[in-house]
């Protein structure tokens, strides 16, 4: 892994850009990059970056993990939700969503910016990651989705 400064340089080199805050809809991402046990503090002052994914753009902040490594953190992680499917591709009727005290706090607010503002300076920890069978977007093929539990520390 890389330091915060190295990771920011890498992301900008691949085309990401710094933007003014969070706007638009929350988009769920499959590859969160989070692992069980990751712990980090949402900075009091953070820069927001925008990453193009196909025709869409997603916004994130960079966080430094307790172990010194850096990762992008997408606020959409707090609202991640997926329907659960059986191995034969039929729906179970269940839906799994991000759990935890940090996710609950974020979801109390009406916008991404307000939710992130409420988390400024707070330390969070990925206390669990649940693997669920779901369908790949726009297809009938099964995939494993990772749904985290993110708690305030």
Residue ranges and their predicted role:
Residues 1-153:
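Short beta-rich binding modules
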């Amino acid at each position: 892994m890389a330091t915060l400064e190295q990771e920011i340089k890498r992301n900008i080199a691949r085309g990401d850009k710094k933007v003014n805050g969070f706007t638009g809809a929350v988009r769920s991402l499959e590859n969160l990059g989070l692992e069980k046990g990751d712990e980090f503090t949402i900075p009091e002052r953070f820069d927001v970056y925008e990453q193009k994914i196909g025709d869409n753009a997603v916004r994130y902040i960079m966080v430094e993990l307790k172990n010194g490594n850096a990762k992008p953190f997408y606020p959409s992680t707090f609202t991640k939700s997926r329907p659960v499917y059986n191995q034969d591709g039929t729906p179970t009727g269940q839906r799994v969503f991000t759990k935890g005290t940090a996710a609950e706090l974020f979801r109390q607010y009406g916008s991404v910016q307000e939710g992130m503002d409420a988390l400024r300076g707070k330390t969070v920890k990925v206390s669990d990651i649940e693997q669920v069978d779901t369908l790949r977007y726009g297809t009938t093929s099964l995939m494993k989705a990772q749904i985290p539990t993110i708690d305030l520390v």
